[in-house]
Amino acid sequence: VSGHRVYLAGPPFAEEYRRRASALVLAAGWEPLDPMRRDFRGNTEGHEAEIVLGDLADIDSCAAVLADFTRPDEGTSMEAWYAHSQGIPVVAYTGGQWAHPWTVYVSASVHNVLEDAVAALAAALGGVPA
């Protein structure tokens, strides 16, 4: 597991989150891993296993998960649960939205502001230097 890779979990069409999160994670000295680099939007039928197994492998290769919980998304929830079940810390970003009990349970910390969530990655990563 790389000590410096952060998986960017979030809804498929959350381009602004992915852009901002990638920039903030890079600025902190870590490598963002965006699963949407394998873009199956509008073409998921017949590719379900490839999508899920690719996402799971990506999560396994990361030291932490930054999860966009600003709106409900099944994939984000499943990715966060999987990471949590594997002992990979999850930091949740809610954008001020209510945090579901499951979000709180699987997350090392929950933040309304994306910058605060990225700052919290250092604690989630056990002080891995930026």
Locate each region found by the language model.
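Conserved catalytic or regulatory cores that recognize and/or transform ribose-phosphate-containing ligands
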Residues: 1-130
